[in-house]
Amino acid sequence: MSRSFTYFLKDRDRPLYDQYVMERYTEGMTGKGTVTPEPKFSFEQPKFRTKDICDELEKISALNTTHPARRYLVDRGISEEHLKSLYYCPNFKEWTNAHKKIFKDTNNDDARIIIPLRDAKGDLFGYQGRSLDPTSRMRYITIMLRDEQKIYGLEKVNGTEQVFVVEGPFDSLFVPNAIAMCGSDVDLSGLNYQFVFVFDNEPRNKQIVEKIDSAINRGYSVVIYPKEVQQKDLNDMVLAGIDVQSMIKCNIYSGLKAKLKFNDWKKV
């Protein structure tokens, strides 16, 4: 078997064959009576998501490059890869009511970007609709299909590594292994993750200051922004050309050091 594999490799890829022979030589696997172990291949099982109501809609990535929904997200710096996980709904109220009666009527219906909320298995339990109308009084509408915590990104995180917690779904797209809280009443206690909280950079905002203080007191790690960063949220930082991932990595604090940095950062 090893002989046939060797000749197969020699016929198909001579440079790789030469490298293979050299590795065998350096490992003492050449010469008379030597048996080369058969190569072992490891394949990860493919993951398939169950179809859900979002599949009725068109993905943002499939829209024309001049489409307002696609342009809005591209202008915010969101990558093509992430556009594949967001959807466009031309009639938000009508589509929502077709699956769960939420609105009394569909008057003044509008088009919205659909941000799916999925659990760790990838099953849809809710969604947010982001209005494309800059004058809308309700920029975000959250619809829950099941009684779950309003968290975006659970299906994408690796729980064995640090999980970054940000304040909005779009911000989470700029940070690896991140989830977003889609409401002020989100309870993360049911998740056994090593959290790092990344709140907005608003040292004069009393609510945000209290949230950071609470996270530190509960023993969590937090990001405290350097004074030279003037932008309020991660999206604005990305648009300003800041390397957000490096900036976050270099400004994670916990315990007493977090307290000292926090007290120096806050303005209220």
Task: Name each model feature, range by range.
Residues 245-268:
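Extended, charge-rich low-complexity interaction segments
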Residues 93-194, 199, 208-209:
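Phosphate-handling DNA/RNA-contact segment within nucleic-acid enzymes
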Residues 189, 205-208, 232-235:
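Short active-site-adjacent structural elements
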